[in-house]
Amino acid sequence: MRLIQLFICIFAISSNNVKSDEYNGVVTRVIDGDSIIVKENGDLNKIRLRYIDAPELSQDYGEESKKFLQNQLLDKSVLVYTEYNDRYGRQLADIYIHNETESIYINAKMIKSGNAWVYKTYRSNSYLINLENHAKMNNKGVWSSQEPLKPWIYRKNMK
């Protein structure tokens, strides 16, 4: 079953017809709930997790989201699938952890646990949207709040 989920994730990612690059590295720092630093062959790469938007650190649930991601990734080996760099020079990427029994798609785990929203601005991803709906129904993470404020609205209000 896990193998099928992995293939579905990879298909959803690769179906965007954009050339991707992949590499292995170690997460040396978690900046917030959707940004990390990955060391690859001595280079430090700033990564923004693709398709998700986590609460800002100054926002409700921002620190919790960061801590969740730290527990998942800090000092661990990861597989990075990067598509392109954003306007801030960060690599937009899908992050995976592999262990003996499974591959874990971290972007999806952040959504499923209620630690991030699906970032629908550029593209919809039905797999992640379904995970978000499940997290909402189960009041997980940010969804435990009556009316959670979406990070992109929070940032807009802070300007």
Question: What would you call each of these model-derived segments?
Answer:
Residues R2-K159:
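Small beta-barrel nucleic-acid-binding modules, primarily SNase/OB-fold domains
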